[in-house]
Amino acid sequence: KPNPERFYGLM
């Protein structure tokens, strides 16, 4: 499952 924290880190 994709972690939102990591997703935001890419931004």
Curated annotation (Swiss-Prot):
The UniProt entry, under InterPro entries, shows: Tachy_Neuro_lke_CS, Tachykinin_dom
Q: Does the keyword Membrane apply?
A: no
Q: What are the GO BP annotations of this UniProt entry?
A: neuropeptide signaling pathway; tachykinin receptor signaling pathway
Q: Which GO terms describe its cellular component?
A: extracellular region
Q: Which Pfam families match?
A: Tachykinin (PF02202)
Organism field: Pelophylax ridibundus (Marsh frog)
Q: What does this protein do?
A: Tachykinins are active peptides which excite neurons, evoke behavioral responses, are potent vasodilators and secretagogues, and contract (directly or indirectly) many smooth muscles.
For the modification Methionine amide, the affected residues are 11
What family is this protein classified in? Belongs to the tachykinin family.
What is the designated name of this protein? Answer: Ranakinin
Q: What is its main location?
A: secreted
The listed locations are: Secreted
Keyword entries, A-Z:
Amidation, Neuropeptide, Secreted
